[in-house]
Amino acid sequence: GSGKYNFVERTAAVERLVREGRYVEACEARYDAFVDLAALLPDEEALPLRWEHPNSRAALSIIYGSAVDHFRIGDLEMSMAQLELLLECDNEDHFESVNLLAMCYVACDEWDAYDDLTLYLSDKSGDAVVTRLWAAFRRSGRVDEQLLALLRSRHRAYYDELRAEEHPDDDAFRRDISSDRP
C-alpha cells in the first residue's frame, strides 16, 4: 500500500506517538487508519488478510489496536464491531482477539454471541479463564470454583491480581496497559 494505505508507515507513526506519550493523538491516528482500512474492505464478505504480508499484518494490528483503544474508553459496541471484523480478516486470530471479544460480549450481556465464542476460549489463556470466570459469576451470582482453581494453578499472576486487596498503579502497570497487548 502507498499513501494513506501504507499501514506499515501508519503503524510506525502511531508507535512513535505512543513513545512520545501522545496517547490521545496515537488513538486518533490509529482510528483514522482503521477508517481508511474499513473503507477498502468489502461489506458483504470477509476478506482474509495475509499475515505474511507486512502491510496486511500492519492493517490487522491497526484493527486490533483500535479495538483495544475503544475497549479502554468503554466504547464496547465499537470494540466488538472492530474485533468481529478482525476475526473475519484474521481467521488464525494472531492477536488472540477472541478473548477481548468474549469479554465485551459478557459486559454487554450478549449471551448468545458469548456462548457461540466459548468454544474458542482456551484454558491456556489467562484472559480467557478470567472471562469465563466473570461470565459464570454474572450468570449465576456465584464464583465457579473449578474455574478459580484452574486460574490459581495455570495462571497464578491473574489469580493473585484477582485476589489482591490492593491494585497499585505503578510505572510497570502503566507501561503494560499502554502497550499493544495489555
Q: Which ranges hold each PLM region?
A:
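Long, ordered, amphipathic alpha-helical scaffolds
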Residues: W134-P182
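Structural motif corresponding to the intra-repeat A-B loop/turn of tetratricopeptide repeats
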Residues: E20, I73, A107-C108, R139-G141
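Hydrophobic, aromatic-enriched interface-forming segments
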Residues: L76, M80-L119, A128-T131
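Alpha-helical repeat scaffolds
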Residues: G1, A26-A33, L76-E84, E110-S122, ...
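Generic helix N-cap/helix-start motif at coil->alpha-helix transitions
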Residues: K4-F7, P54-I63, D90-V98, D123-T131
